[in-house]
Structures are given as C-alpha cells and as structure tokens.
Amino acid sequence: MEALVYTFLLVSTLGIIFFAIFFREPPKIQTKKTK
C-alpha cells in the first residue's frame, strides 16, 4: 500500500513538472495571437 502512495506521488510530481514545461512555451504563441 505504501508503495502505491509513493508511486502516485512520484507520478503526480512528474506530471506537474511536465505540464509546467509543456505549458510554459505555448502561452508565448497564444499571447501573441490574442494581441
């Protein structure tokens, strides 16, 4: 059970970092399009 919690925490942290990097570049193009 503990292993599952640790794995979930690791995956969630990795997902947040991945999303942060992935959504860090597109906004530049989106802000340019909206303006």
Curated annotation (Swiss-Prot):
Similarity-based family: Belongs to the PsbT family.
UniProtKB keywords: Chloroplast, Membrane, Photosynthesis, Photosystem II, Plastid, Thylakoid, Transmembrane, Transmembrane helix
Location of the protein in the cell: Plastid, Chloroplast thylakoid membrane
Keyword Hydrolase attached: no
GO biological process: photosynthesis
One of the record's GO cellular component terms: chloroplast thylakoid membrane
Topology in the lipid bilayer: Single-pass membrane protein
Known role: Found at the monomer-monomer interface of the photosystem II (PS II) dimer, plays a role in assembly and dimerization of PSII. PSII is a light-driven water plastoquinone oxidoreductase, using light energy to abstract electrons from H(2)O, generating a proton gradient subsequently used for ATP formation.
Protein name: Photosystem II reaction center protein T
Chain ranges passing through the membrane: 3-23
Organism: Oenothera argillicola
Subunit organization: PSII is composed of 1 copy each of membrane proteins PsbA, PsbB, PsbC, PsbD, PsbE, PsbF, PsbH, PsbI, PsbJ, PsbK, PsbL, PsbM, PsbT, PsbY, PsbZ, Psb30/Ycf12, at least 3 peripheral proteins of the oxygen-evolving complex and a large number of cofactors. It forms dimeric complexes.
Pfam families membership: PsbT
InterPro entries: PSII_PsbT (IPR001743), PSII_PsbT_sf (IPR037268)
Disulfide bond keyword on record: no
